[in-house]
Curated annotation (Swiss-Prot):
Record's protein name: Myeloid differentiation primary response protein MyD88
Gene Ontology molecular function: TIR domain binding; Toll-like receptor binding
A UniProt-annotated Pfam family: TIR_2
Protein keywords: Cytoplasm, Immunity, Inflammatory response, Innate immunity, Nucleus
Domain notes: The intermediate domain (ID) is required for the phosphorylation and activation of IRAK.
Record's GO cellular component terms: cytoplasm; cytosol; nucleus; plasma membrane
Domain TIR: 162-296
Annotated source species: Gallus gallus
Segments of this protein annotated with the region Intermediate domain: 114-158
Domain Death: 34-113
Length: 299
């Protein structure tokens, strides 16, 4: 992969010429964790994560909020991806680190960053080279035999798969709210078809594989039911991050956060820049189900 010069007086840092077109999702957890090791410590002589936050347009109060988190660098990058899905690129991150004078980070992490980007671009190239199929057919064919017959109405031999309008991401303690959602969206004039894990998914298969299959290939949208209990759920965390990792151009349209209870904890930072449906707001509650339904009915 081609590299570009880093400029006079700069420490070497390999950067493929097209890194400004590579989204931040290409960077894996290893690189993000090591980046935090460099930027999280507050230093008087070197630019830390707060300087990067200012470069990304965060104000004082936003930086103070991130400061309370265990890994502010990781949270900052997640928020950047959510706020600017088209502009949050690896090339832009490296350019900001150069502007901040963090050539040590570029030198130490440059090889790992380039390797992550190569892997990402290879995956995208392989996807582009796949034989073209009719989208409606392609999206309904399970990737492996393990994913045939995973819902109650699937054909066990893979000849027909059940499709849904929305995948509902929720924790067990919010199941009562989900049952109300079923009544309001499925059993009314909206006649939507929701994928509710406890009701629609057959037992006996890997939870993570099923979740990925349903979110990416079987459901047009994903509703995330937000509460304090949601924040404690590893399963909900995986499902949300998986949905956000899908194509940047479609993810904001795909994912709809719903706040179902008053929260003591802070709203998830990775969802902060997506418009929510707030069930707890008495002033807008009468419009709640209609707004949510119409959002799910969009093409």
């Amino acid at each position: 992969m081609a590299t570009v010069p880093v400029g006079a007086g700069s420490a070497p840092g390999p950067e493929p010429a097209d890194l400004h077109s590579v989204p931040m999702v290409a960077l894996n957890y290893g690189v993000r964790r090591r980046l935090g090791l460099y930027l999280n410590p507050r230093a008087a002589t070197a630019a830390d994560w707060t300087a990067l936050a200012e470069k990304l347009g965060h104000d004082y109060l936003e930086i103070r909020r991130l400061e309370a988190l265990p890994d502010p660098t990781a949270a900052l990058l997640e928020e950047w991806q959510s706020r600017c899905p088209g502009g949050a690129t690896v090339g832009q991150l490296l350019e900001l680190l150069r502007q901040l004078g963090r050539h040590d980070v570029l030198l130490e992490l440059g090889g790992s960053v380039e390797e992550d980007c190569k892997k990402y671009l290879r995956r995208k190239q392989q996807e582009a080279e796949q034989p073209l199929q009719v989208p409606a057919v392609d999206s309904s064919v399970p990737k492996t035999s393990e994913l045939m017959g995973i819902t109650t109405r699937d054909d066990p031999y893979g000849h027909g798969t059940e499709m849904f309008d929305a995948f509902i991401c929720y924790c067990q303690k919010d199941l009562q709210f989900v049952q109300e959602m079923i009544r309001e969206l499925e059993q009314t004039e909206f006649k939507l078809k929701l994928c509710v894990f406890d009701r629609d998914v057959l037992p006996g298969t890997c939870v993570w594989s099923i979740s990925g299959e349903l979110i990416e290939r079987r459901c047009r949208r994903m509703v995330v039911v937000i509460s304090d209990d949601y924040l404690e759920s590893d399963e909900c965390d995986f499902q949300t991050k998986f949905a956000l990792s899908l194509s940047p151009g479609a993810r904001l349209k795909r994912l709809i956060p719903v706040k179902c209870k008053t929260m003591k904890n802070e709203f998830p930072s990775i969802l902060r820049f997506i418009t929510i449906c707030d069930y707890t707001n008495p002033c807008t509650k009468k419009w709640f189900w209609t707004r949510l339904a119409k959002s799910l009915l969009l093409p």
